[in-house]
Amino acid sequence: MPKVSVLVAVYNAEKHLRACLDSLLNQSLKDIEIVCVDDASTDNSLALLNEYAAKDERLKVATLAENSGISHTRNVALGMSTGEYVCMVDSDDWLSADALQLSAEVLDTEQEVDCVLFDFIIAERDDVQGTYTRQRRYNSMPFCRISGLRACELSLDWRIHGLYMIRRAIHLQYPYDESSPVYSDENTTRVHYWASREVAQCAGKYFYRQHAESATHAPNLNKYYRLDAYKSLKQFLQSHADTRFLCARFENMRWLTVVDLYYEYYKTWRQLSRTEQQMVKKRLKAAWQDIDLSLLSSKDTRKFGYMPLRFSWLAFRMQEELYFFVRAMRDKMR
């Protein structure tokens, strides 16, 4: 059994895949396996994976017949893994050479710690140099060790980030949430924190490559799947006695997200096909209907533009579109 399994879900990642794999194969901790699953890429990603696997037996490669989304792809990788500890690295990101060693050492020596966060560095593209040397540390709340429940609470609004190494048993018990093609992996982070006795940090760096092609920045319909992912997390929080105190805070987050995503739709609906418009409106309506009004704070429901108006979906839509029109006119006058 290797000390660490690194899960890498790959989809059309040939541009940055070499940098990712090189950073993993050059780790100071050698007792590792790198489990790469190609999610039916249409570029040269699979060929690159096979090229690297032929040179280093620590790299395992599998491929999916059809595109299945990042959570399912990671679950396939998780099922292939055998390491004592598990972490994931996105195929366009990279690690400092000591990242796996430092995080594994914490888990080896701190028996009550089940999860170790990396030092999260955001690498932004310098358009002049064409490099990712513009780097900044994620603004995470500093801590040494905290309970898993506290970490779950802090991750609801990302006061701590979600990039970590975890003990294998926990990850197998709670695989990646597949309730949504995107964003549901964020739910898994919160569940992993909740399932951990204690959560710690290490100095090993995870470099997140922020660029226009990143899944979280792509100008497409993926953002609306956050509504599905949030519903799944709500169900989890409601189903455990020790997380129910978080339900009201999270429900207010959900409500603000519904309004924010309606605004996104208001700005872009003309660019969508009729089928896409119907899909977005269906998701927005389902989320609007599912909000538990008893959990919402009055400051988030009494303002124009934020009143649920549960008696009528049409009335709610009319309120939103008038509110967004007035807001746009106000912004133009500034």
Segments predicted by a language model, with ranges:
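Cell-envelope/extracellular polymer assembly enzymes that use nucleotide-activated donors
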Residues: 2-5, 33, 187
